[in-house]
Design a protein with these regions (language model features):
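Gram-negative/organellar outer-membrane beta-barrel architecture
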Residues: 97, 116-367, 373, 479-480, ...
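C-terminal outer-membrane beta-barrel translocator/porin domains of Gram-negative envelope proteins
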Residues: 147-149, 163-172, 328-507, 512, ...
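Active/binding-pocket-proximal capping segment
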Residues: 100, 124, 172-175, 246-247, ...
Length: 586
Protein backbone atom coordinates (compact mmCIF):
# COMPACT_ATOMS: atom_id res chain seq x y z
CA UNK A 1 0.00 0.00 0.00
CA UNK A 2 0.98 3.58 -0.68
CA UNK A 3 0.26 6.68 1.34
CA UNK A 4 -2.06 9.13 -0.41
CA UNK A 5 -3.39 11.79 1.98
CA UNK A 6 -2.57 12.63 5.61
CA UNK A 7 -5.05 14.83 7.47
CA UNK A 8 -4.52 16.21 10.99
CA UNK A 9 -7.53 16.74 13.24
CA UNK A 10 -7.62 18.39 16.67
CA UNK A 11 -4.20 20.02 16.56
CA UNK A 12 -3.97 23.60 17.84
CA UNK A 13 -0.42 23.77 19.17
CA UNK A 14 1.39 22.76 15.99
CA UNK A 15 0.34 23.49 12.40
CA UNK A 16 -0.54 20.63 10.07
CA UNK A 17 2.25 21.48 7.63
CA UNK A 18 4.82 21.38 10.45
CA UNK A 19 3.45 18.04 11.69
CA UNK A 20 3.74 16.60 8.17
CA UNK A 21 7.39 17.67 8.06
CA UNK A 22 8.06 15.90 11.36
CA UNK A 23 6.22 12.75 10.23
CA UNK A 24 8.63 12.40 7.27
CA UNK A 25 6.10 10.32 5.31
CA UNK A 26 4.82 12.02 2.18
CA UNK A 27 2.31 11.24 -0.53
CA UNK A 28 3.43 8.32 -2.69
CA UNK A 29 5.63 6.68 -0.03
CA UNK A 30 5.17 3.03 0.87
CA UNK A 31 2.80 2.78 3.86
CA UNK A 32 5.19 1.69 6.62
CA UNK A 33 3.42 1.26 9.96
CA UNK A 34 6.68 0.60 11.85
CA UNK A 35 8.21 3.85 10.59
CA UNK A 36 5.01 5.72 11.42
CA UNK A 37 5.04 4.40 15.01
CA UNK A 38 8.67 5.46 15.44
CA UNK A 39 7.95 8.97 14.13
CA UNK A 40 4.89 9.35 16.34
CA UNK A 41 6.23 7.95 19.64
CA UNK A 42 9.53 6.06 19.37
CA UNK A 43 12.27 8.40 18.11
CA UNK A 44 13.96 11.03 20.25
CA UNK A 45 12.47 13.71 17.98
CA UNK A 46 9.10 11.94 17.65
CA UNK A 47 5.97 14.08 17.40
CA UNK A 48 4.76 12.87 20.78
CA UNK A 49 7.90 14.15 22.47
CA UNK A 50 7.25 17.68 21.19
CA UNK A 51 3.94 17.59 23.06
CA UNK A 52 5.42 15.97 26.17
CA UNK A 53 8.16 18.60 26.32
CA UNK A 54 5.50 21.33 26.48
CA UNK A 55 3.64 19.65 29.34
CA UNK A 56 0.93 17.85 27.36
CA UNK A 57 1.15 14.61 29.36
CA UNK A 58 -2.47 13.71 28.59
CA UNK A 59 -1.95 14.11 24.84
CA UNK A 60 -3.15 11.23 22.66
CA UNK A 61 -2.77 10.62 18.93
CA UNK A 62 -4.79 7.98 17.12
CA UNK A 63 -3.90 7.33 13.43
CA UNK A 64 -7.01 6.09 11.61
CA UNK A 65 -7.13 4.58 8.10
CA UNK A 66 -10.21 6.40 6.84
CA UNK A 67 -10.10 5.30 3.21
CA UNK A 68 -8.47 2.46 1.29
CA UNK A 69 -8.74 2.86 -2.47
CA UNK A 70 -6.94 0.15 -4.42
CA UNK A 71 -3.31 0.32 -3.27
CA UNK A 72 -3.67 3.78 -1.68
CA UNK A 73 -4.48 4.72 1.91
CA UNK A 74 -5.77 7.95 3.41
CA UNK A 75 -4.80 8.61 7.03
CA UNK A 76 -6.51 10.84 9.55
CA UNK A 77 -4.34 11.77 12.57
CA UNK A 78 -6.79 12.41 15.42
CA UNK A 79 -5.14 14.38 18.23
CA UNK A 80 -6.46 15.02 21.71
CA UNK A 81 -4.04 17.54 23.14
CA UNK A 82 -5.58 17.94 26.59
CA UNK A 83 -4.39 20.49 29.17
CA UNK A 84 -0.80 21.22 30.06
CA UNK A 85 0.26 19.40 33.21
CA UNK A 86 2.44 20.86 35.91
CA UNK A 87 4.58 18.91 38.34
CA UNK A 88 2.96 18.54 41.74
CA UNK A 89 5.27 16.41 43.90
CA UNK A 90 8.80 15.10 43.39
CA UNK A 91 9.85 12.27 45.68
CA UNK A 92 13.31 10.77 46.01
CA UNK A 93 13.46 7.15 47.17
CA UNK A 94 16.49 4.99 47.95
CA UNK A 95 18.92 7.79 48.81
CA UNK A 96 20.73 6.91 52.04
CA UNK A 97 24.08 8.60 51.36
CA UNK A 98 23.54 12.22 50.36
CA UNK A 99 21.54 15.04 51.88
CA UNK A 100 18.35 15.26 49.85
CA UNK A 101 19.01 18.83 48.75
CA UNK A 102 22.26 17.63 47.11
CA UNK A 103 20.20 15.35 44.84
CA UNK A 104 17.36 17.82 44.30
CA UNK A 105 19.66 20.58 43.09
CA UNK A 106 20.59 18.37 40.11
CA UNK A 107 16.98 17.80 39.07
CA UNK A 108 15.34 19.63 36.16
CA UNK A 109 11.93 18.37 37.32
CA UNK A 110 10.78 20.65 40.14
CA UNK A 111 7.34 21.22 41.70
CA UNK A 112 5.39 23.91 39.87
CA UNK A 113 7.23 23.49 36.55
CA UNK A 114 5.47 22.33 33.41
CA UNK A 115 6.16 18.66 32.81
CA UNK A 116 8.81 18.03 30.16
CA UNK A 117 10.09 14.68 28.97
CA UNK A 118 13.34 16.37 27.94
CA UNK A 119 13.78 17.69 31.51
CA UNK A 120 13.02 14.21 32.86
CA UNK A 121 15.73 12.64 30.69
CA UNK A 122 18.21 15.38 31.59
CA UNK A 123 17.53 14.84 35.30
CA UNK A 124 18.22 11.15 34.80
CA UNK A 125 21.56 12.00 33.24
CA UNK A 126 22.55 14.44 36.00
CA UNK A 127 21.78 11.90 38.74
CA UNK A 128 23.84 9.25 36.92
CA UNK A 129 26.80 11.64 36.56
CA UNK A 130 26.89 12.22 40.33
CA UNK A 131 28.38 8.74 40.74
CA UNK A 132 26.53 7.96 43.99
CA UNK A 133 23.75 5.87 42.44
CA UNK A 134 23.69 2.84 40.16
CA UNK A 135 23.11 4.40 36.72
CA UNK A 136 21.57 1.17 35.40
CA UNK A 137 18.78 1.23 38.01
CA UNK A 138 17.65 4.87 38.05
CA UNK A 139 13.89 4.65 37.54
CA UNK A 140 11.74 7.79 37.23
CA UNK A 141 8.12 6.84 37.93
CA UNK A 142 5.73 9.38 36.37
CA UNK A 143 2.18 9.34 37.78
CA UNK A 144 -0.30 11.57 35.89
CA UNK A 145 -3.38 12.89 37.68
CA UNK A 146 -5.99 13.84 35.03
CA UNK A 147 -8.38 15.16 37.68
CA UNK A 148 -6.02 17.90 38.86
CA UNK A 149 -4.06 18.23 35.63
CA UNK A 150 -0.78 17.46 37.41
CA UNK A 151 1.88 14.75 37.57
CA UNK A 152 3.86 13.33 40.46
CA UNK A 153 7.40 12.06 39.85
CA UNK A 154 9.01 9.41 42.03
CA UNK A 155 12.76 9.01 41.56
CA UNK A 156 13.60 5.44 42.59
CA UNK A 157 17.35 5.27 43.20
CA UNK A 158 19.82 2.61 44.29
CA UNK A 159 22.73 4.00 46.31
CA UNK A 160 26.21 2.64 45.72
CA UNK A 161 29.55 3.06 47.46
CA UNK A 162 31.71 5.53 45.58
CA UNK A 163 34.70 6.05 47.88
CA UNK A 164 37.98 4.53 46.74
CA UNK A 165 40.95 3.05 48.61
CA UNK A 166 44.29 2.16 47.05
CA UNK A 167 46.79 0.32 49.24
CA UNK A 168 49.98 -1.53 48.40
CA UNK A 169 53.01 -2.54 50.47
CA UNK A 170 56.14 -4.58 50.00
CA UNK A 171 59.88 -4.78 50.40
CA UNK A 172 62.46 -4.12 47.72
CA UNK A 173 66.06 -3.16 47.22
CA UNK A 174 65.27 0.34 48.44
CA UNK A 175 63.55 -0.87 51.62
CA UNK A 176 59.85 -0.49 52.40
CA UNK A 177 57.67 0.18 49.34
CA UNK A 178 54.11 1.34 49.82
CA UNK A 179 51.25 3.50 48.69
CA UNK A 180 48.05 4.57 50.39
CA UNK A 181 45.40 6.68 48.71
CA UNK A 182 41.99 7.54 50.17
CA UNK A 183 39.32 9.19 48.05
CA UNK A 184 36.14 10.27 49.84
CA UNK A 185 33.50 11.34 47.31
CA UNK A 186 30.72 12.25 49.75
CA UNK A 187 32.67 14.53 52.07
CA UNK A 188 31.08 17.45 53.93
CA UNK A 189 33.39 20.32 54.83
CA UNK A 190 30.55 22.11 56.64
CA UNK A 191 30.04 19.17 58.99
CA UNK A 192 33.74 19.06 59.75
CA UNK A 193 33.52 22.39 61.55
CA UNK A 194 29.84 22.49 62.49
CA UNK A 195 28.59 19.04 63.38
CA UNK A 196 24.90 18.55 62.62
CA UNK A 197 22.40 15.91 63.68
CA UNK A 198 23.13 14.12 60.39
CA UNK A 199 26.86 13.67 61.09
CA UNK A 200 27.55 10.13 59.90
CA UNK A 201 30.44 7.83 60.79
CA UNK A 202 33.97 8.92 61.64
CA UNK A 203 34.14 11.25 58.62
CA UNK A 204 31.66 14.07 57.94
CA UNK A 205 29.70 13.28 54.80
CA UNK A 206 26.53 14.04 52.90
CA UNK A 207 27.40 17.08 50.72
CA UNK A 208 28.89 15.23 47.73
CA UNK A 209 32.28 16.94 47.98
CA UNK A 210 35.52 15.06 47.20
CA UNK A 211 38.51 14.81 49.53
CA UNK A 212 41.59 12.88 48.38
CA UNK A 213 44.63 12.11 50.55
CA UNK A 214 47.54 10.04 49.29
CA UNK A 215 51.07 9.09 50.24
CA UNK A 216 53.73 6.98 48.58
CA UNK A 217 57.17 5.79 49.62
CA UNK A 218 59.98 3.80 48.12
CA UNK A 219 62.15 3.60 51.20
CA UNK A 220 64.50 6.51 51.74
CA UNK A 221 64.76 7.19 48.02
CA UNK A 222 61.30 8.48 47.22
CA UNK A 223 58.42 9.94 49.18
CA UNK A 224 55.38 11.88 48.02
CA UNK A 225 52.29 13.28 49.71
CA UNK A 226 49.26 15.07 48.32
CA UNK A 227 45.86 16.33 49.39
CA UNK A 228 43.02 17.79 47.31
CA UNK A 229 39.47 19.03 47.83
CA UNK A 230 36.70 19.57 45.27
CA UNK A 231 33.23 21.04 45.74
CA UNK A 232 30.93 20.83 42.66
CA UNK A 233 28.43 23.35 44.16
CA UNK A 234 30.56 25.85 46.06
CA UNK A 235 28.24 27.73 48.40
CA UNK A 236 25.41 25.28 47.67
CA UNK A 237 23.29 27.66 45.54
CA UNK A 238 24.79 27.54 42.05
CA UNK A 239 26.72 24.87 40.09
CA UNK A 240 30.03 26.71 40.47
CA UNK A 241 32.88 24.39 41.42
CA UNK A 242 35.82 25.10 43.70
CA UNK A 243 39.02 23.09 44.08
CA UNK A 244 42.25 23.33 46.03
CA UNK A 245 45.23 20.97 46.20
CA UNK A 246 48.79 20.70 47.49
CA UNK A 247 51.61 18.19 47.10
CA UNK A 248 55.18 17.49 48.17
CA UNK A 249 57.71 14.91 46.97
CA UNK A 250 61.41 14.19 47.35
CA UNK A 251 63.63 11.77 45.48
CA UNK A 252 67.25 11.04 46.32
CA UNK A 253 70.06 9.47 44.36
CA UNK A 254 72.23 6.42 44.89
CA UNK A 255 75.73 6.96 46.21
CA UNK A 256 78.60 6.31 43.84
CA UNK A 257 79.86 3.83 46.43
CA UNK A 258 77.02 1.53 45.37
CA UNK A 259 78.37 1.19 41.85
CA UNK A 260 81.88 0.51 43.15
CA UNK A 261 80.47 -2.12 45.49
CA UNK A 262 78.40 -3.65 42.71
CA UNK A 263 81.47 -3.89 40.53
CA UNK A 264 83.48 -5.58 43.29
CA UNK A 265 80.67 -8.02 44.10
CA UNK A 266 80.49 -9.01 40.46
CA UNK A 267 84.27 -9.42 40.51
CA UNK A 268 84.13 -11.73 43.53
CA UNK A 269 81.12 -13.50 42.08
CA UNK A 270 83.10 -14.33 38.97
CA UNK A 271 85.99 -15.85 40.91
CA UNK A 272 84.32 -17.34 43.97
CA UNK A 273 80.75 -18.05 42.87
CA UNK A 274 78.98 -15.87 45.51
CA UNK A 275 75.61 -14.49 44.45
CA UNK A 276 75.28 -10.85 43.53
CA UNK A 277 72.98 -10.22 46.50
CA UNK A 278 74.80 -12.42 48.99
CA UNK A 279 74.66 -10.76 52.38
CA UNK A 280 72.61 -7.88 50.94
CA UNK A 281 75.71 -5.99 49.76
CA UNK A 282 74.01 -4.83 46.55
CA UNK A 283 70.84 -3.44 48.11
CA UNK A 284 70.20 0.23 47.28
CA UNK A 285 69.01 0.73 50.84
CA UNK A 286 72.60 0.78 52.09
CA UNK A 287 73.69 3.46 49.63
CA UNK A 288 71.22 6.28 50.20
CA UNK A 289 72.81 9.65 49.31
CA UNK A 290 70.89 12.63 50.80
CA UNK A 291 73.30 15.08 49.15
CA UNK A 292 71.80 14.30 45.73
CA UNK A 293 68.09 14.98 45.50
CA UNK A 294 65.20 16.70 43.80
CA UNK A 295 62.36 18.17 45.85
CA UNK A 296 59.05 19.27 44.41
CA UNK A 297 56.16 21.00 46.06
CA UNK A 298 53.23 23.01 44.87
CA UNK A 299 49.64 24.09 45.28
CA UNK A 300 46.70 25.04 43.10
CA UNK A 301 43.33 26.70 43.42
CA UNK A 302 40.56 26.46 40.85
CA UNK A 303 37.08 27.68 40.05
CA UNK A 304 34.57 26.50 37.46
CA UNK A 305 31.18 27.60 36.15
CA UNK A 306 28.45 25.74 34.32
CA UNK A 307 27.48 27.77 31.25
CA UNK A 308 24.07 28.35 29.68
CA UNK A 309 25.37 29.06 26.18
CA UNK A 310 25.83 27.39 23.72
CA UNK A 311 24.07 24.89 26.05
CA UNK A 312 24.31 23.93 29.70
CA UNK A 313 26.53 20.91 29.06
CA UNK A 314 29.41 23.40 28.79
CA UNK A 315 31.67 24.39 31.68
CA UNK A 316 34.38 27.03 31.92
CA UNK A 317 37.10 26.65 34.55
CA UNK A 318 40.25 28.45 35.63
CA UNK A 319 43.09 27.15 37.80
CA UNK A 320 46.06 29.02 39.23
CA UNK A 321 48.95 26.74 40.17
CA UNK A 322 52.46 27.08 41.54
CA UNK A 323 55.24 24.46 41.58
CA UNK A 324 58.80 24.67 42.84
CA UNK A 325 61.64 22.31 41.94
CA UNK A 326 64.75 22.24 44.14
CA UNK A 327 67.71 20.46 42.53
CA UNK A 328 70.68 19.39 44.61
CA UNK A 329 73.45 17.81 42.54
CA UNK A 330 70.73 16.07 40.52
CA UNK A 331 71.85 14.88 37.09
CA UNK A 332 68.68 13.28 35.69
CA UNK A 333 66.62 16.26 34.57
CA UNK A 334 68.52 16.92 31.32
CA UNK A 335 68.16 20.71 31.25
CA UNK A 336 70.91 21.79 28.87
CA UNK A 337 72.40 25.21 29.61
CA UNK A 338 74.11 27.70 27.31
CA UNK A 339 77.52 26.84 28.77
CA UNK A 340 77.16 23.27 27.51
CA UNK A 341 76.51 21.73 30.92
CA UNK A 342 73.34 20.13 32.22
CA UNK A 343 71.63 21.83 35.12
CA UNK A 344 72.12 19.81 38.32
CA UNK A 345 71.81 22.38 41.12
CA UNK A 346 69.37 25.25 41.40
CA UNK A 347 65.73 26.18 41.75
CA UNK A 348 62.96 26.27 39.16
CA UNK A 349 59.56 27.89 39.65
CA UNK A 350 56.41 27.31 37.61
CA UNK A 351 53.54 29.77 38.05
CA UNK A 352 50.74 29.22 35.53
CA UNK A 353 47.10 29.89 34.77
CA UNK A 354 45.05 27.16 33.11
CA UNK A 355 41.80 28.01 31.29
CA UNK A 356 39.57 25.14 30.15
CA UNK A 357 36.37 25.05 28.12
CA UNK A 358 34.74 21.61 28.36
CA UNK A 359 31.52 19.86 27.39
CA UNK A 360 30.25 16.51 28.65
CA UNK A 361 26.92 15.09 27.47
CA UNK A 362 27.55 11.39 28.17
CA UNK A 363 24.69 9.40 29.66
CA UNK A 364 26.71 7.24 32.06
CA UNK A 365 30.03 7.90 33.83
CA UNK A 366 31.18 4.25 33.87
CA UNK A 367 29.87 2.78 30.60
CA UNK A 368 28.75 5.63 28.31
CA UNK A 369 26.51 4.65 25.41
CA UNK A 370 25.66 8.04 23.96
CA UNK A 371 26.97 11.56 24.07
CA UNK A 372 30.39 13.10 23.86
CA UNK A 373 33.19 14.65 25.88
CA UNK A 374 35.56 17.36 24.79
CA UNK A 375 37.89 19.88 26.36
CA UNK A 376 40.01 22.70 24.97
CA UNK A 377 42.55 24.29 27.28
CA UNK A 378 45.42 26.72 27.36
CA UNK A 379 47.99 26.93 30.14
CA UNK A 380 50.04 30.13 30.34
CA UNK A 381 52.92 31.50 32.35
CA UNK A 382 53.95 35.16 32.37
CA UNK A 383 56.31 35.94 29.43
CA UNK A 384 59.29 36.78 31.62
CA UNK A 385 61.75 36.91 28.70
CA UNK A 386 59.78 39.72 27.02
CA UNK A 387 60.44 42.02 29.98
CA UNK A 388 64.00 41.03 30.93
CA UNK A 389 65.88 42.77 28.05
CA UNK A 390 68.39 39.90 27.97
CA UNK A 391 69.93 38.11 25.02
CA UNK A 392 69.24 34.48 25.94
CA UNK A 393 71.17 33.15 22.94
CA UNK A 394 74.44 33.91 24.78
CA UNK A 395 73.20 34.33 28.34
CA UNK A 396 75.38 32.45 30.84
CA UNK A 397 77.78 30.94 28.31
CA UNK A 398 80.71 31.43 30.66
CA UNK A 399 78.97 31.15 34.02
CA UNK A 400 76.99 28.17 35.35
CA UNK A 401 75.00 30.15 37.93
CA UNK A 402 73.99 32.74 35.36
CA UNK A 403 73.05 30.05 32.85
CA UNK A 404 71.00 28.17 35.46
CA UNK A 405 69.16 31.35 36.42
CA UNK A 406 67.47 31.28 32.99
CA UNK A 407 65.16 28.64 34.43
CA UNK A 408 64.48 30.20 37.81
CA UNK A 409 61.09 31.11 36.39
CA UNK A 410 59.85 28.79 33.66
CA UNK A 411 57.82 30.22 30.79
CA UNK A 412 55.64 28.56 28.16
CA UNK A 413 52.17 28.39 26.66
CA UNK A 414 50.54 24.98 26.35
CA UNK A 415 47.52 24.18 24.16
CA UNK A 416 45.50 20.97 24.34
CA UNK A 417 42.37 19.54 22.78
CA UNK A 418 40.72 16.23 23.69
CA UNK A 419 37.50 14.68 22.45
CA UNK A 420 35.54 11.45 22.70
CA UNK A 421 32.24 10.39 21.15
CA UNK A 422 30.04 7.42 22.06
CA UNK A 423 27.57 5.72 19.73
CA UNK A 424 25.38 2.76 20.71
CA UNK A 425 24.96 0.30 17.85
CA UNK A 426 21.73 -1.21 19.22
CA UNK A 427 19.14 -0.39 21.86
CA UNK A 428 18.93 -1.65 25.42
CA UNK A 429 21.41 -1.68 28.28
CA UNK A 430 23.66 -4.47 26.98
CA UNK A 431 24.60 -2.99 23.64
CA UNK A 432 27.90 -2.64 21.75
CA UNK A 433 29.26 0.90 21.77
CA UNK A 434 31.78 2.59 19.49
CA UNK A 435 34.04 5.15 21.16
CA UNK A 436 36.14 7.44 18.97
CA UNK A 437 38.99 9.59 20.25
CA UNK A 438 41.00 12.54 18.95
CA UNK A 439 43.46 14.65 20.93
CA UNK A 440 46.55 16.76 20.45
CA UNK A 441 48.82 19.03 22.43
CA UNK A 442 51.39 21.74 21.72
CA UNK A 443 53.96 23.26 24.08
CA UNK A 444 55.09 26.63 22.78
CA UNK A 445 57.63 29.22 23.92
CA UNK A 446 57.92 33.01 24.03
CA UNK A 447 61.67 32.91 23.32
CA UNK A 448 63.27 30.12 21.27
CA UNK A 449 66.37 30.22 23.48
CA UNK A 450 64.30 29.76 26.65
CA UNK A 451 62.19 26.70 25.88
CA UNK A 452 60.61 25.12 28.94
CA UNK A 453 62.16 21.80 30.05
CA UNK A 454 58.96 21.15 32.02
CA UNK A 455 55.37 20.40 30.98
CA UNK A 456 56.56 18.33 27.99
CA UNK A 457 54.70 15.22 26.81
CA UNK A 458 55.83 11.73 27.87
CA UNK A 459 54.23 9.41 25.32
CA UNK A 460 53.83 5.67 24.97
CA UNK A 461 52.51 2.76 26.99
CA UNK A 462 49.71 2.58 29.52
CA UNK A 463 49.53 6.28 30.38
CA UNK A 464 50.03 5.74 34.10
CA UNK A 465 52.31 8.29 35.79
CA UNK A 466 55.33 6.98 37.66
CA UNK A 467 57.76 8.84 39.90
CA UNK A 468 60.78 7.44 38.10
CA UNK A 469 59.80 8.51 34.60
CA UNK A 470 59.14 12.20 34.22
CA UNK A 471 59.08 14.87 36.88
CA UNK A 472 56.98 17.55 35.28
CA UNK A 473 55.82 15.94 32.06
CA UNK A 474 52.30 15.00 31.05
CA UNK A 475 51.91 11.27 30.47
CA UNK A 476 50.12 10.31 27.23
CA UNK A 477 49.12 6.71 26.60
CA UNK A 478 49.73 4.88 23.33
CA UNK A 479 49.13 1.17 23.67
CA UNK A 480 51.35 -1.20 21.72
CA UNK A 481 54.52 0.71 22.67
CA UNK A 482 56.63 0.76 25.82
CA UNK A 483 56.15 3.51 28.39
CA UNK A 484 57.76 6.72 27.21
CA UNK A 485 59.32 5.04 24.18
CA UNK A 486 58.18 7.78 21.78
CA UNK A 487 59.79 10.49 23.93
CA UNK A 488 63.03 9.11 25.45
CA UNK A 489 65.34 11.32 27.52
CA UNK A 490 66.87 13.96 25.30
CA UNK A 491 63.91 13.78 22.90
CA UNK A 492 61.15 15.27 25.01
CA UNK A 493 57.80 15.81 23.35
CA UNK A 494 56.77 19.39 22.56
CA UNK A 495 53.85 18.29 20.38
CA UNK A 496 51.75 15.14 20.16
CA UNK A 497 48.66 13.71 18.52
CA UNK A 498 46.59 10.63 19.34
CA UNK A 499 43.67 9.17 17.37
CA UNK A 500 41.75 5.98 17.99
CA UNK A 501 38.54 3.99 18.12
CA UNK A 502 37.24 1.31 20.47
CA UNK A 503 34.42 -1.21 20.21
CA UNK A 504 33.10 -1.94 23.70
CA UNK A 505 30.67 -4.59 24.89
CA UNK A 506 29.33 -4.85 28.48
CA UNK A 507 29.72 -8.22 30.19
CA UNK A 508 28.29 -7.17 33.57
CA UNK A 509 26.61 -3.95 34.71
CA UNK A 510 25.76 -4.34 38.37
CA UNK A 511 25.81 -2.07 41.40
CA UNK A 512 28.90 -3.76 42.85
CA UNK A 513 30.79 -4.54 39.64
CA UNK A 514 30.84 -3.39 36.03
CA UNK A 515 32.87 -5.28 33.41
CA UNK A 516 33.23 -4.65 29.70
CA UNK A 517 35.45 -6.01 26.93
CA UNK A 518 36.97 -3.89 24.20
CA UNK A 519 38.87 -4.04 20.95
CA UNK A 520 40.75 -1.01 19.67
CA UNK A 521 42.87 0.57 16.99
CA UNK A 522 44.86 3.73 17.62
CA UNK A 523 47.72 5.80 16.35
CA UNK A 524 49.81 8.65 17.66
CA UNK A 525 53.20 10.27 17.77
CA UNK A 526 55.21 12.97 19.53
CA UNK A 527 57.72 15.47 18.18
CA UNK A 528 60.62 17.38 19.73
CA UNK A 529 59.51 20.67 18.20
CA UNK A 530 56.14 22.21 17.39
CA UNK A 531 57.33 22.94 13.84
CA UNK A 532 57.69 19.18 13.24
CA UNK A 533 54.07 18.46 14.14
CA UNK A 534 52.53 16.13 11.52
CA UNK A 535 49.18 14.47 12.32
CA UNK A 536 49.67 12.03 9.42
CA UNK A 537 52.96 10.65 10.74
CA UNK A 538 51.55 8.17 13.25
CA UNK A 539 52.72 5.07 15.10
CA UNK A 540 49.91 2.53 14.79
CA UNK A 541 48.64 -0.24 17.05
CA UNK A 542 45.66 -2.52 17.65
CA UNK A 543 44.59 -4.82 20.43
CA UNK A 544 41.99 -6.09 22.88
CA UNK A 545 41.35 -5.59 26.57
CA UNK A 546 38.95 -5.70 29.48
CA UNK A 547 37.87 -3.13 32.10
CA UNK A 548 36.55 -3.81 35.60
CA UNK A 549 35.01 -1.16 37.82
CA UNK A 550 34.88 -1.88 41.56
CA UNK A 551 33.41 0.84 43.81
CA UNK A 552 36.21 0.75 46.41
CA UNK A 553 39.01 0.57 43.82
CA UNK A 554 37.74 2.34 40.72
CA UNK A 555 38.47 1.43 37.12
CA UNK A 556 41.20 -1.08 36.34
CA UNK A 557 42.00 -3.36 33.45
CA UNK A 558 44.49 -5.05 31.19
CA UNK A 559 45.15 -4.55 27.46
CA UNK A 560 47.15 -6.54 24.96
CA UNK A 561 48.30 -4.47 21.99
CA UNK A 562 50.53 -4.92 18.97
CA UNK A 563 52.60 -1.99 17.75
CA UNK A 564 53.02 -2.06 13.97
CA UNK A 565 55.81 0.50 13.63
CA UNK A 566 59.46 1.05 14.52
CA UNK A 567 60.41 3.89 16.84
CA UNK A 568 63.42 6.18 17.21
CA UNK A 569 65.49 4.52 14.54
CA UNK A 570 65.05 1.03 16.00
CA UNK A 571 65.51 -1.89 13.65
CA UNK A 572 62.64 -3.86 15.18
CA UNK A 573 58.91 -3.29 15.37
CA UNK A 574 57.37 -2.55 18.74
CA UNK A 575 55.38 -5.79 18.57
CA UNK A 576 53.40 -7.38 21.38
CA UNK A 577 52.86 -5.39 24.59
CA UNK A 578 50.76 -5.89 27.72
CA UNK A 579 49.47 -2.85 29.61
CA UNK A 580 47.91 -2.68 33.05
CA UNK A 581 45.42 0.14 33.51
CA UNK A 582 44.44 1.80 36.78
CA UNK A 583 42.06 4.73 36.79
CA UNK A 584 39.64 6.24 34.29
CA UNK A 585 41.21 8.22 31.49
CA UNK A 586 39.50 11.24 29.97
Amino acid sequence: YYLRNVTWVGNTIYASDWLNEQLRMKKGDVYNQKLMTERLTGDEDAIGNYYYNKGYVFYNLDPVEVNIDGDSIDLEMRIQEGPQASISKVRINGNDRLYENVVRRELRTKPGDLFSKEALERSYREIAQMGHFNPENIQPDVQPDPTNGTVDINWNLESKANDQVEFSAGWGQTGVIGKLSLKFTNFSMANLFHKSDNYRGFLPQGDGQTLTISGQTNGSYYQSYSVSFFDPWFGGKRPNSFSVSAFYSIQTDISSNYYNSAYMNNYYNYYSGYGNYYGGYNNYESYYDPDKSIQMYGASIGWGKRLRWPDDYFTLSAELSYQRFILKDWSYLYIKLNNGEYMSTGNCNNLSLNLTLARNSTDNPIFPRRGSEFSASVQLTPPYSLFSNKDYSVYGKDDYDEAASMFNWIEYHKWKFKSKTYTALTGGQKCPVIMTRAEFGLLGHYNKYKKSPFETFYMGGDGMTGYSTSYASETIALRGYENGSLTPYGSEGYAYVRLGAELRYPLMLENSTSIYALGFIEGGNAWTDVSKFNPFQLKRSAGVGVRIFLPMIGMMGIDWAYGFDKINGSSRYSGSQFHFILGQEF
